[in-house]
Protein backbone atom coordinates (compact mmCIF):
# COMPACT_ATOMS: atom_id res chain seq x y z
CA UNK A 1 0.00 0.00 0.00
CA UNK A 2 1.66 3.18 -1.14
CA UNK A 3 -0.50 5.43 1.05
CA UNK A 4 0.80 3.98 4.34
CA UNK A 5 4.14 5.86 4.63
CA UNK A 6 2.33 9.17 4.15
CA UNK A 7 -0.41 8.07 6.50
CA UNK A 8 2.07 7.11 9.21
CA UNK A 9 3.41 10.66 9.26
CA UNK A 10 -0.13 12.01 9.45
CA UNK A 11 -0.98 9.58 12.25
CA UNK A 12 2.09 10.69 14.13
CA UNK A 13 1.12 14.34 13.85
CA UNK A 14 -2.45 13.52 14.82
CA UNK A 15 -1.41 11.52 17.90
CA UNK A 16 0.79 14.37 19.06
CA UNK A 17 -2.10 16.79 18.51
CA UNK A 18 -4.45 14.66 20.56
CA UNK A 19 -2.19 14.66 23.60
CA UNK A 20 -3.65 17.89 24.92
CA UNK A 21 -7.20 16.60 24.34
CA UNK A 22 -6.91 13.17 25.97
CA UNK A 23 -9.85 11.68 27.83
CA UNK A 24 -9.99 8.42 29.77
CA UNK A 25 -13.67 7.88 28.96
CA UNK A 26 -14.78 6.41 25.68
CA UNK A 27 -14.64 9.61 23.67
CA UNK A 28 -13.98 8.78 20.03
CA UNK A 29 -12.37 11.22 17.62
CA UNK A 30 -13.75 10.67 14.12
CA UNK A 31 -12.35 12.74 11.27
CA UNK A 32 -11.10 12.70 7.72
CA UNK A 33 -7.71 13.82 6.42
CA UNK A 34 -7.33 13.86 2.65
CA UNK A 35 -8.12 10.31 1.44
CA UNK A 36 -8.20 8.70 4.90
CA UNK A 37 -10.90 8.75 7.54
CA UNK A 38 -10.29 7.49 11.05
CA UNK A 39 -11.77 6.73 14.45
CA UNK A 40 -9.49 6.95 17.49
CA UNK A 41 -10.08 6.34 21.19
CA UNK A 42 -7.83 7.02 24.21
CA UNK A 43 -6.51 4.37 26.58
CA UNK A 44 -7.70 3.88 30.13
CA UNK A 45 -4.30 3.33 31.81
CA UNK A 46 -2.54 6.13 29.94
CA UNK A 47 -4.96 8.38 28.10
CA UNK A 48 -2.17 9.42 25.72
CA UNK A 49 -2.05 5.86 24.36
CA UNK A 50 -4.42 5.67 21.39
CA UNK A 51 -6.23 2.89 19.55
CA UNK A 52 -6.88 3.87 15.94
CA UNK A 53 -8.86 2.57 12.98
CA UNK A 54 -7.94 4.06 9.58
CA UNK A 55 -9.98 3.70 6.39
CA UNK A 56 -8.61 4.75 2.97
CA UNK A 57 -10.63 5.51 -0.12
CA UNK A 58 -7.76 3.90 -2.09
CA UNK A 59 -9.23 0.59 -0.86
CA UNK A 60 -12.77 1.76 -1.74
CA UNK A 61 -13.32 2.15 2.01
CA UNK A 62 -13.51 -1.63 2.35
CA UNK A 63 -10.50 -2.19 4.64
CA UNK A 64 -9.52 -0.93 8.06
CA UNK A 65 -5.95 -0.53 9.29
CA UNK A 66 -5.74 -0.93 13.07
CA UNK A 67 -3.05 0.88 15.02
CA UNK A 68 -2.26 1.58 18.64
CA UNK A 69 0.31 3.73 20.37
CA UNK A 70 2.18 3.57 23.64
CA UNK A 71 3.88 6.49 25.36
CA UNK A 72 7.08 5.60 27.20
CA UNK A 73 9.45 7.64 29.31
CA UNK A 74 12.24 5.09 28.96
CA UNK A 75 15.01 6.52 26.78
CA UNK A 76 17.35 3.71 25.70
CA UNK A 77 19.92 4.76 23.12
CA UNK A 78 18.93 1.96 20.76
CA UNK A 79 15.16 2.56 20.71
CA UNK A 80 15.22 3.38 16.97
CA UNK A 81 16.30 -0.20 16.20
CA UNK A 82 12.72 -1.26 17.04
CA UNK A 83 11.41 0.55 13.94
CA UNK A 84 9.66 -1.88 11.52
CA UNK A 85 10.20 -4.82 13.89
CA UNK A 86 7.41 -7.07 15.05
CA UNK A 87 7.26 -7.00 18.86
CA UNK A 88 5.50 -9.60 20.99
CA UNK A 89 2.24 -8.54 22.59
CA UNK A 90 -0.70 -10.09 24.36
CA UNK A 91 -4.17 -9.06 23.26
CA UNK A 92 -6.50 -10.07 26.07
CA UNK A 93 -3.95 -12.74 26.99
CA UNK A 94 -3.50 -14.11 23.45
CA UNK A 95 0.08 -13.88 22.20
CA UNK A 96 0.74 -12.28 18.81
CA UNK A 97 2.97 -9.56 17.37
CA UNK A 98 2.53 -5.93 16.36
CA UNK A 99 4.70 -4.02 13.91
CA UNK A 100 6.43 -0.83 15.07
CA UNK A 101 5.44 1.73 12.42
CA UNK A 102 6.89 4.92 13.93
CA UNK A 103 8.96 6.12 16.89
CA UNK A 104 8.46 9.78 17.76
CA UNK A 105 10.22 11.88 20.38
CA UNK A 106 7.70 13.15 22.89
CA UNK A 107 8.26 15.30 25.96
CA UNK A 108 10.74 13.30 28.06
CA UNK A 109 10.22 10.06 26.17
CA UNK A 110 8.80 8.53 23.02
CA UNK A 111 5.48 7.75 21.39
CA UNK A 112 5.65 4.36 19.67
CA UNK A 113 3.03 3.64 16.99
CA UNK A 114 2.20 0.00 16.26
CA UNK A 115 0.13 -1.73 13.58
CA UNK A 116 -2.01 -4.81 14.11
CA UNK A 117 -2.67 -5.09 10.39
CA UNK A 118 -5.25 -4.38 7.73
CA UNK A 119 -8.56 -6.21 7.60
CA UNK A 120 -11.87 -6.30 5.67
CA UNK A 121 -13.87 -3.66 7.50
CA UNK A 122 -17.25 -5.35 7.99
CA UNK A 123 -15.91 -8.70 9.13
CA UNK A 124 -13.27 -7.15 11.38
CA UNK A 125 -15.64 -4.77 13.14
CA UNK A 126 -18.05 -7.67 13.73
CA UNK A 127 -15.15 -9.80 15.03
CA UNK A 128 -14.06 -7.03 17.44
CA UNK A 129 -17.65 -6.42 18.53
CA UNK A 130 -18.11 -10.12 19.34
CA UNK A 131 -14.63 -10.39 20.91
CA UNK A 132 -15.21 -7.35 23.12
CA UNK A 133 -18.72 -8.54 24.00
CA UNK A 134 -17.33 -11.78 25.42
CA UNK A 135 -14.13 -10.43 26.97
CA UNK A 136 -15.54 -7.07 28.14
CA UNK A 137 -12.08 -5.61 27.55
CA UNK A 138 -9.57 -4.82 24.83
CA UNK A 139 -6.21 -4.99 26.55
CA UNK A 140 -2.77 -4.90 24.95
CA UNK A 141 0.36 -5.78 26.87
CA UNK A 142 3.81 -5.56 25.30
CA UNK A 143 5.76 -8.61 26.50
CA UNK A 144 9.31 -9.97 26.51
CA UNK A 145 10.47 -11.81 23.42
CA UNK A 146 13.62 -13.21 21.86
CA UNK A 147 16.32 -10.54 22.30
CA UNK A 148 13.67 -8.08 23.50
CA UNK A 149 13.15 -7.04 27.13
CA UNK A 150 10.07 -4.88 27.48
CA UNK A 151 11.27 -3.07 30.65
CA UNK A 152 14.21 -1.61 28.70
CA UNK A 153 11.85 0.26 26.37
CA UNK A 154 8.47 0.66 28.11
CA UNK A 155 7.80 1.91 31.62
CA UNK A 156 4.08 1.08 31.37
CA UNK A 157 3.74 -1.86 28.94
CA UNK A 158 -0.03 -2.39 29.28
CA UNK A 159 -3.17 -0.48 28.42
CA UNK A 160 -6.81 -1.13 27.65
CA UNK A 161 -9.46 0.64 25.66
CA UNK A 162 -13.24 0.78 25.87
CA UNK A 163 -14.94 -0.34 22.67
CA UNK A 164 -18.65 -0.07 23.46
CA UNK A 165 -18.97 2.57 20.73
CA UNK A 166 -16.66 0.88 18.21
CA UNK A 167 -19.31 -0.06 15.63
CA UNK A 168 -21.03 3.35 15.46
CA UNK A 169 -17.65 5.11 15.42
CA UNK A 170 -16.35 2.98 12.53
CA UNK A 171 -19.66 3.48 10.71
CA UNK A 172 -19.28 7.26 11.04
CA UNK A 173 -15.64 7.09 9.86
CA UNK A 174 -16.67 4.92 6.89
CA UNK A 175 -19.32 7.47 5.90
CA UNK A 176 -16.61 10.15 5.87
CA UNK A 177 -14.54 7.97 3.54
Regions found by a protein language model. Name each.
Residues 1-24:
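Classical Sec-dependent N-terminal signal peptides that target proteins to the secretory pathway
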Residues 23-177:
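A generic "folded-domain core" signal
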Amino acid sequence: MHWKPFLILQIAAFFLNLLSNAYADEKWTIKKFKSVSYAIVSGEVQSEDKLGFFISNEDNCKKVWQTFSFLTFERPGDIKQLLHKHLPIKLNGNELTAKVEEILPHSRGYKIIFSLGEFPIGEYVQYLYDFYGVEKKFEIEIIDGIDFKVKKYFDIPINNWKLENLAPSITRATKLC
